[in-house]
Amino acid sequence: MKLIELAARLGAELRGDAELEVTGVQGIEEAGPTEVTFVANPRYAALARTTKAAAVLVEPDFPEISAATLRIRNPYHAFSRTLGLFYQPPAYPPGVHPTAMIDPSAVIGEGAHIGAYVVIGPGVRLGMRATLLPHVVLYPGMQAGSHLFAHAHAVVREGCVLGDHVTIENGAIIGADGFGFSKNEAGQWEKIPQSGPVRLGDRVDVQANACVDRATVGQTEIGAGTKIDNLVQVGHGSRVGSDTLLCAQVGLAGSSVVGDRAILAGQAGVAGHCTLGDGVILTAQSGVSHDVPAGKMVSGSPAFDNRLWLRAVALFQRLPELAKRLDRLEKRLAASEAASDKEQA
């Protein structure tokens, strides 16, 4: 593809050789003379001057460099679109593999691809163009809209409801029993039935080995456009809003509430029954044990305001030095007081 064609498809301003052929996309340090790269983070701006890439996707006001530039707002999103032009994932034609087990009562929309050893239980309803790769299991009564894409070994449990264009990655489990137990009179833990399904909105992505547990009563809800990273745990009865990001190893205890457009960075944890407002940001490894108002960024464990946390961390790093200074001051004060006592005597 010529650069001029790529610029037209992206709606970018091209500065450089319009006839240059490009064959793919790569990171800024790895890109070669026929590949496109991007700069979205200012820390990588210097690398744009030395890159071997054919062209660099940059912001409109980016300084001139020797490589051709494609100038566009949000170069990172433009990079994503460019990847889609050059990388085509495997295609899965409609059809049912002979080893698949499909209950006669299941209703499957047109254009579905049902892979090897897929199991579809009674009463399942799938919209058009579902793709179920090998060993996917759909429990009785689950429902999904159009364009469900379930990768190998994904599981959706009984009664769960999925919207349109939902993607379930390898090993993810939607609707497993929540962690609910009560002690009986003998002091033994007894399982509490987990009767409530999971509901995923449109365009939800649940990545590899993540778990969204079913509710004790009611339902566990994930809003439209929310993305759930690998190894995330969403506890029973939790509610997550729309267009929220739950990054790797985030854990939500039961009945957590997370608003729209929130970002929970890696390994952040939220205690049960806490509410996080719209637009909240939890930085990596934050531990939240209380409600967080909309728009707040918090850090640390226990989590508190990010700006205060940064100051506290800076102070924490100085504690050994400050302890030595305090020790010296205490010794000087003690010596001064001893001398004063002698004079008074």
Residue ranges and their predicted role:
Residues 38, 95-305:
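Structural signal for interior beta-strand "rungs" in well-ordered beta-sheet cores
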Residues 1-99, 160, 165, 171-172, ...:
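Terminal amphipathic alpha-helical/low-complexity segments used for targeting or macromolecular assembly
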